[in-house]
């Protein structure tokens, strides 16, 4: 059993604070064997660059490039079709000439899977490649790459289907100029359906295609935005979902998850940021999830290691927001974003000076023990809206002077 702290990484802003890169740095520095996503779902986009290798993590934990196994907790969502595309991207990179023999080191040209078609609600079919990988290498003397990474998912995690995605996009489009800034991945619709009191599709159900088809039919029947669905299509989609799920996921029980946490060999990876919290953010521009450390702390307490928790608050030297909603002191800071661009659903990537009141609010709600401060290569200190203003940040555990893992330094 490890004796060092169990780190819970959460965002202090509106997302894009460097949570994934922080998880990668902590895993690599400490040799941690596991990462656990405890909130949010497949709508996350955590960018990690390790020695020039880039990947955007949505399904897999951000410690994957450093060799950590990926776990998903009971309060998360998963999308089997998106997951198999992401897995394929990693596998293509490993087999395409970029692998150097080290476990978990995909090609630097690997990219995250393409999102579902933004105009029609069509998902990439399970047999279609999600990204264009590196070309096959003519060098046949390379060692055989490791098998495709897999994800251990709690049996209670909710499953997003193409129907959730279609309804999500139709609902968001109908809002017109009042759009909320949805990611268009069906995450909110998946959570909302469960909150309505219906029995949702969960990871533990994914071994039975008939049960999956029944869930799809009931969801379509109950939706106010789906007129009709062909029964044959439902049967095919149920088989596709089951097949994709089996290729990526291994279902685990409460006991298995808590046993892993009890070893202390884990970094807990949060998604989104405090200012998007379902209860603490500014409605309606929020997510359907708690973005504080609460759910991770709860799991650690149930596993008997609650006293070892260390909360790591991730933030940039400046504030950002991807999509609609309030962003105090918004300004064009002249920052070039390599991996955050305007998208049809999330919207524009925006920047701002930090508002002292907002930052104090986030610190008060999250109560981080330490900070992971990124983009120190862009601004050498936290960029406040009022020059010289301070907010009393906790000690910096991880300082990032660039996007790569090698640009990050850990205190102590």
Regions found by a protein language model. Name each.
Residues 1-99, 141-412:
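Non-transmembrane, aqueous-exposed alpha-helical and coiled segments at domain scale
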Residues 95-148:
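Intrinsically disordered, low-complexity terminal tails and inter-domain linkers enriched
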């Amino acid at each position: 059993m490890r004796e060092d702290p169990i780190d819970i990484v959460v965002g202090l802003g509106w997302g894009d604070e460097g949570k994934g890169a922080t998880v990668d740095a902590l895993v690599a520095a400490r040799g941690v064997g596991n990462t656990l996503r405890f909130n949010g779902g497949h709508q996350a986009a955590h960018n990690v660059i390790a020695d020039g290798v880039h990947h955007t993590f949505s399904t897999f934990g951000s410690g994957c490039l450093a060799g950590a196994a990926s776990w998903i907790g009971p309060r998360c969502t998963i999308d089997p079709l998106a997951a198999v595309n992401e897995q394929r991207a990693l596998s293509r990179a490993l087999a395409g000439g970029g692998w150097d023999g080290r476990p978990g080191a995909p090609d630097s040209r690997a990219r995250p899977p393409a999102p579902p078609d933004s105009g029609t609600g069509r998902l990439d079919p399970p047999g279609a490649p999600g990204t264009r990988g590196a070309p096959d290498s003519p060098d046949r003397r390379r060692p055989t790459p490791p098998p495709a990474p897999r994800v251990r998912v709690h049996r209670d995690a909710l499953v997003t289907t193409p129907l959730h995605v279609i309804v999500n996009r139709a609902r968001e489009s109908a809002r017109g100029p009042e759009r909320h800034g949805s990611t268009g991945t069906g995450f909110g619709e998946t959570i909302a359906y469960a909150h309505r009191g219906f029995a949702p599709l969960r990871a533990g159900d994914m071994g039975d295609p008939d049960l999956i088809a029944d869930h799809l039919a009931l969801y379509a029947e109950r939706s106010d935005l789906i007129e009709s669905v062909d029964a044959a299509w439902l049967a095919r989609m149920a088989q596709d979902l089951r097949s994709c799920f089996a290729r990526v996921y291994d279902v685990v029980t409460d006991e298995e998850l808590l046993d892993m946490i009890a070893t202390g060999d884990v970094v807990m990876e949060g998604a989104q940021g405090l200012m998007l919290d379902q209860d603490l953010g500014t409605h309606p521009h929020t997510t359907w999830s708690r973005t504080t450390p609460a759910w991770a702390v709860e799991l650690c307490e149930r596993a008997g290691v609650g006293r070892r928790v260390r909360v790591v608050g991730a933030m940039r030297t400046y504030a950002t927001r991807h999509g609609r909603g309030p962003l105090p002191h918004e300004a064009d800071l002249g920052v070039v974003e390599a991996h955050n661009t305007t998208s049809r659903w999330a919207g524009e990537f925006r920047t701002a000076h930090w508002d002292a009141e907002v930052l104090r609010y986030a610190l008060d709600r999250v109560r981080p023990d330490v900070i992971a401060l990124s983009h120190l290569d862009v601004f050498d200190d936290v960029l406040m809206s009022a020059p010289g203003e301070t907010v009393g940040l906790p000690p910096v555990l991880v300082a990032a002077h660039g996007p790569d893992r090698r640009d990050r330094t850990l205190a102590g």
